[in-house]
């Protein structure tokens, strides 16, 4: 469950290391984002020669949350930390690699490029 002011790790090689959610997209009064939702983030920490720099405002897809994700079969999946992947306006990832596992709920949200780049889909 991601809301405004939440800090997230970045799970790609775009150059950002840590971002902060500044808006949850998808409705004027929407408060929370879960796995697969698009949010607007501000880059808080970045590596020196990355594609993005500190202070950039980007869109991102939430790929891991510490809050449980309930599945139709009754099972739940949760991660240790919140993480996101930075995307452009065409909803394609900015980085060329994805780090760590991603849940298969991203497939239902049409984030196929992230699924294909991920080393493991849970």
Curated annotation (Swiss-Prot):
Family (UniProt): Belongs to the universal ribosomal protein uL14 family.
Q: What does this protein do?
A: Binds to 23S rRNA. Forms part of two intersubunit bridges in the 70S ribosome.
Q: Which CDD domains match?
A: Ribosomal_uL14
Which Pfam families does the annotation name? Answer: Ribosomal_L14 (PF00238)
> Would the keyword S-adenosyl-L-methionine be found if you checked this record's keyword annotation?
no
Which NCBIfam families does the entry mention? rplN_bact
SUPFAM superfamilies given for it? Ribosomal protein L14 (SSF50193)
Got a GO cellular component term for this one?
cytosolic large ribosomal subunit
Per its record, how is this protein called by name? Large ribosomal subunit protein uL14
Keyword Iron-sulfur carried by entry:
no
What domain of life does the native source organism fall in? Answer: Bacteria
Keyword line: Ribonucleoprotein, Ribosomal protein, RNA-binding, rRNA-binding
Among the GO molecular function terms of this UniProt record, one is: large ribosomal subunit rRNA binding
One record GO biological process: translation
**Complex and partners:** Part of the 50S ribosomal subunit. Forms a cluster with proteins L3 and L19. In the 70S ribosome, L14 and L19 interact and together make contacts with the 16S rRNA in bridges B5 and B8.
Q: Which InterPro entries does the annotation name? A: Ribosomal_uL14 (IPR000218), Ribosomal_uL14_bac-type (IPR005745), Ribosomal_uL14_CS (IPR019972), Ribosomal_uL14_sf (IPR036853)
